[in-house]
A protein has these predicted regions:
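A structural supersecondary motif
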Residues: 15-17, 38-79, 199
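His/Glu-based metal-binding/catalytic segments typifying zinc-dependent metallopeptidases
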Residues: 1-43, 206-207
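Second-shell loop/turn segments in exported
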Residues: 17-23, 33-37, 72-82, 95-101, ...
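Buried hydrophobic packing residues in well-ordered domains
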Residues: 16, 31-34, 50, 75, ...
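M16/insulysin-pitrilysin zinc metalloprotease superfamily fold
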Residues: 65-121, 189-193, 202-205
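Short acidic/His-enriched helical or mixed secondary-structure segments at domain edges of catalytic enzymes
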Residues: 1-11, 48-57, 68, 101, ...
Length: 207
């Protein structure tokens, strides 16, 4: 766990992350499908809990940024300073409980959302260029969008839960918090991940 002091800040920026599968891996698309109900929109668990239920933030999301080596998983939000610890606990508990809470409804909602989204996904020139760039960078075949559709329709609940169990473990992730050290630094030790490592704004360790 890392902390960056932003003196007198009224908000805390929270980032949670880890490295996952390499870009170009056939498992990456499956992982992105499973992530959808964790942090892929308004109806996902992070947004629903932190914004709609608790009112701690305007937004909370998680996503995968495909990379040639290992693809980073990120979950993030900006919350009111006085609920920093409470928000961190929500991130931890939602991520750790995601595999067991994931159900058939989650999977079907995700499938319908992504299938419908594909109808409009490549209407813009920029989207087509991005698709070609992705194909070139990761060596995807011309049929990779079709292949993704087939994977999407075939993935089952047991496989989705197995993917979540393998990849979403907050106890093995990095937590980075930027906020007011004076009021929040001691509190967040209650999260159970030990004393935070202090960094400056450039990411250098402060002794």
């Amino acid at each position: 766990m890392f902390f960056i002091d932003i003196p007198d800040s009224k908000q805390s920026a929270i980032s949670v992350g880890t490295l996952t599968v390499p870009g170009g891996s056939p498992e990456l698309f499956k992982l992105s499908v499973v992530n959808n109900r964790l942090g892929g929109g308004m109806e996902a668990r992070l947004m629903r809990t932190l914004r709609l239920e608790k009112g701690y933030t305007y937004g909370a999301r998680s996503f995968l940024r495909e990379n040639t080596f290992q693809t980073p998983f990120y979950a993030y939000s900006q919350v009111r300073s006085n609920v920093t610890l409470e928000s961190l606990k929500i991130f931890r508990d939602i991520i750790n409980g995601y595999a067991e809470s994931y159900n058939n409804q989650d999977l079907e909602i995700t499938k319908n959302k992504l299938i419908k989204g594909n109808a409009l996904r490549f209407e813009r020139l920029a989207s087509l260029i991005n698709m070609l760039d992705t194909m070139s960078k990761f060596g995807y075949p011309d049929t990779y969008i079709q292949n993704e559709q087939e994977v999407l329709t075939s993935i089952g609940l047991d496989e989705a839960r197995s993917i979540a169990r393998l990849n979403f473990n907050a106890n093995k992730m990095y937590f980075v918090i930027a906020g007011d050290a004076k009021t929040q630094l001691n509190r967040i030790e209650e999260l159970g991940y030990g004393k935070p490592i202090i960094l400056d704004r450039e990411g250098n360790k402060i002794n």
